[in-house]
Amino acid sequence: MKRFITLLLLLALTTALLTGCHGGKKRVAFRVPMEFDESKQYEISFWAKNDTNITQVNIYRQAIADFEALYPNIHVNLKTYTDYATIYQDVITNIATDTTPNVCITYPDHIATYQKGSNVVVQIDALMADPNYGLGGSKLKFDGPTEEEIVPKFLQECFIGDGHYALPYMRSTEALYINKDLVTKLGYDIPDVPTWDYIWEVSEAAMKQDADGVFLVNGQTTLIPFIYKSTDNMMISMLKQKDAPYSDSEGHVLLFNDTTKEILYSIVPHAKSRSFSTFKISSYPGNYLNA
């Protein structure tokens, strides 16, 4: 399932599909200032997800460095998380003590929960429309996108209740990467449309070892034939492929069915043989691609 990631702004200085908090100050309704005071020092806390991927962390750090070079009176404090659920829980926990971040990455459906607090999340419609500092603003020191340059469907997902409370950050997707050299070495061709039966068969074939525990296909003592980043998405995709339900638009949970049980039982042997692993068990799959 492709999930839409947003930056939510919690009552603070910034706007974007980020969630931000007040800290120890009394929360008051946000108003767009007439001017940006460049003589005043600002400190912004930013909570982001990086999947333990140092490449992502370095991208955040570089973006922050570039931003601070343009705005030397703004200092961004980055805190990274390995999953969205922990960010979500930490924001909720910190709302009570006014120690939420100024900006954070979130899913749109998390925003409704944050809104239960008074003046916790900033409605940013006025800021988006501001001719100076809004979308495509004339006084921005960088080439900011105009509203017309944002995919309308993505922006619509940031409209929660009575207005916009976030800006689009990224749309995730998934792809199947195949090590052609290893698969060919095992004696298999790569089909135009790989099936689960094909994936499991090739993965099990790759598990063959010699007497010393060395994998025959790569000559090493370590091998993960098949790894999936998100087991949530894996289940959603497998149910979709079998025309089986997962949930509906009204929020009903439908995944507890015979097809789900069948899928789980089909995966068990490959988990036991260790021909299959996940992000939670091993690591971020991209780390292996970058190795």
Residue ranges and their predicted role:
Residues R31-V32, F36, P108-T173, F215-L216, ...:
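Hinge/lid segment of periplasmic solute-binding proteins
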Residues M34-F36, W47-K49, Q56, Q62-I64, ...:
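Extracytoplasmic/periplasmic substrate-binding proteins
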Residues T80-D90, W196-Y198, T278-N290:
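Short helix-initiation/N-cap motifs at beta->coil->alpha
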Residues D51-N53, D83-T86, D109-A112, S172-A175, ...:
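Solvent-exposed loop/turn segments at secondary-structure junctions
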Residues M1-I44, A69:
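Short, low-complexity disordered leader/linker segments with a strong preference
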Residues A69, K79, D125-P131, Q156-N233, ...:
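Helix-loop-helix "hinge/cap" segment bordering the ligand-binding cleft or interdomain interface
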Residues Q41-E43, N53-A112:
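Early extracytoplasmic/lumenal segment of secretory-pathway proteins
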Residues V57-I64, Y88, I92, P108-I111, ...:
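Extracytoplasmic/secreted envelope proteins and their assembly/folding machinery
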